[in-house]
């Protein structure tokens, strides 16, 4: 490889082919990209050690999960923290196989893997291994959040080692394809684990209207996915005159009873991650990043950005494992917030949004939904969700939702919803036509809803009047897509572009076996999907 870097794991990769210049489209430098490859290679080496040694423990799995999560797009831009992770991985490998370093044989069985071997592999092998690796990275984010709440699953943990091991082996397509599908299977189990962790910790989400107006006075904006960090921040700010506003994927937190009981959790600020450099530029408040998606902050507001957990960026203030958010709170008090209430709107001008329509809430109204379908009030369901992003063409999803007929229901999730979640679509059968199921990991909830409807109507999921129209950006979308394929769900529309790491042969396999297809135009796709 004669280029400076190679990365094609996100939807915005350069030229829909791969970032190969001095920096990635996401903003990471060539040095960070190289270190992420080194970290991944070290994790493959660790998986080899796990395969050869029985002495694994909770620390082994936490390190493997943390290392994978750190390589997800827009998580870590910090050379120092990635180097520290590499050192920790090497130390853990040495602990697992202490006799290996003194062995006179140089078998290389437990060595780090050279990622250049993957990037230069035959394109179909590279494609399948990329699906395994990127899917494992996305799944690691969910496992990490569950782990922070004290929930873990040995089968899920061991699969991370299995997936990494497969990346480093010289296996053919017949050996790799079952592991690709197993990513989807294990991610379903992992999302179920996180759903259990969240609901047992914070209660079952219920529908709630969330204001977009920011009240006067000091406030903190918290973004990302980690509900545990939000809970700790709410506890530490209670009674201090500092209000809390969610941003991006943190919006669904408002539906959880144990979070919304805090009176100073006031509302939601801003929209999806790709708009942060504009939205954060002038706010008189700090922003706390708990997970991706962090964009390189502009100098005008960098002193107000804080990171925690695996999120890291050079020279930003990082909140460590003690989770003492005092610096964030002090910054909020010093900045003071707005002098008077300041109204904001969503992308389409709406002043409020709704969330909290998780599987618990929707299935709680199952009789109402079933009756609406049987009576003809509801003709079709659409799941329009997934990642937000900056590539031109994503307004497709706004127009698609706007054009859905009045006798259809739109379920949504993840940050792609901000393109349309402030629209007023009215009600149907006593329910809102637009229902936010939650974060990207709440795809598990959408699956539960679909399976319950199929059971109620005595049919398969693919026989339901249900269509999936998905947007993707990073690696969590990869593992969710593989979960849907594992469940045998067909006729998915995916956009705004197809992954650069999917080779033509692998794409043909997906098209032939699952009828997955790229989005075209809202008008044409609606016409086709409503005929099903």
Predicted regions located by residue number:
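Anaerobic metallocofactor- and corrinoid-dependent redox/one-carbon enzyme cores
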Residues: 2-32, 36, 41-45, 178, ...
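Electropositive, gly/pro-rich neighborhoods at or near active sites that engage anionic ligands
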Residues: 43-201
């Amino acid at each position: 490889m004669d280029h400076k870097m190679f990365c094609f794991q996100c939807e915005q990769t350069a030229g829909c082919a791969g970032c190969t210049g001095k920096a990635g489209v996401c903003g990471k430098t060539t040095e960070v990209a190289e270190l992420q490859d080194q970290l991944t290679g070290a994790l493959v080496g660790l998986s080899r050690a796990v395969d050869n040694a029985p002495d694994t423990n909770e620390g082994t799995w936490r390190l493997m999960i943390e290392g994978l999560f750190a390589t997800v797009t827009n998580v870590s831009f910090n050379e120092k923290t990635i180097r520290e992770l590499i050192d920790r991985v090497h130390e853990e490998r040495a602990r697992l196989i202490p006799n290996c370093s003194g062995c006179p044989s140089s078998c290389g069985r437990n060595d780090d893997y050279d990622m250049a071997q993957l990037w230069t592999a035959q394109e179909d092998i590279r494609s399948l291994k990329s699906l395994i690796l990127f899917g494992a990275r996305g799944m690691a984010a969910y496992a990490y959040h569950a782990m922070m709440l004290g929930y873990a699953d040995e089968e899920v943990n061991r699969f991370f080692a299995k997936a990494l091991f497969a990346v480093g082996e010289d296996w053919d397509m017949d050996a790799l394809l079952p592991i690709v599908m197993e990513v989807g299977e294990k991610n379903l189990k992992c999302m179920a684990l996180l759903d259990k962790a969240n609901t047992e910790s914070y209660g079952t989400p219920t529908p709630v209207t969330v204001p977009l107006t920011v009240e006067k006075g000091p406030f903190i904006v918290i973004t990302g996915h980690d509900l545990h960090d939000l809970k700790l921040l709410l506890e530490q700010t209670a009674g201090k005159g500092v209000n809390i506003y969610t941003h991006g994927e943190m919006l669904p937190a408002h539906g959880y009873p144990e979070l919304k009981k805090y009176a100073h959790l006031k509302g939601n600020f801003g929209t999806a991650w790709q708009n942060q450099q504009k939205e954060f530029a002038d706010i008189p408040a700090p922003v706390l990043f708990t997970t991706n998606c962090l964009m390189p902050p502009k100098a005008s507001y960098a002193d107000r950005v804080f990171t925690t957990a695996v999120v890291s960026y050079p020279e930003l203030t990082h909140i460590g494992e003690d989770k003492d958010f005092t610096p964030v709170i002090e910054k909020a008090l010093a900045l003071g917030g707005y002098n008077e209430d300041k109204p904001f709107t969503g992308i389409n001008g709406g002043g409020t949004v709704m969330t909290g329509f998780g599987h618990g809430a929707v299935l709680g109204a199952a009789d109402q939904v079933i009756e609406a379908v049987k009576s003809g009030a509801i003709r079709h369901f659409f799941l329009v969700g997934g990642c937000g992003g900056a590539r031109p063409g994503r307004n497709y999803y706004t127009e698609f939702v706007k054009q859905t007929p009045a006798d259809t229901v739109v379920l949504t999730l993840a940050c792609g919803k901000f393109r349309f979640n402030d629209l007023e679509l009215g009600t149907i059968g006593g329910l809102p036509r637009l229902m936010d199921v939650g974060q990207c990991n709440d795809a598990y909830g959408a699956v539960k809803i679909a399976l319950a409807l199929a059971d109620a109507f005595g049919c398969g999921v693919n026989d339901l009047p249900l269509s999936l129209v998905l947007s993707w950006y990073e690696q969590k979308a990869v593992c969710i897509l593989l979960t849907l394929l594992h469940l045998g769900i067909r006729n998915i529309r995916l956009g705004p572009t197809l992954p650069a790491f999917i080779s033509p042969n692998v794409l043909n396999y997906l098209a032939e076996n699952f009828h997955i297809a790229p989005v075209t135009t809202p008008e044409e796709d609606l016409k086709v999907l409503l005929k099903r």
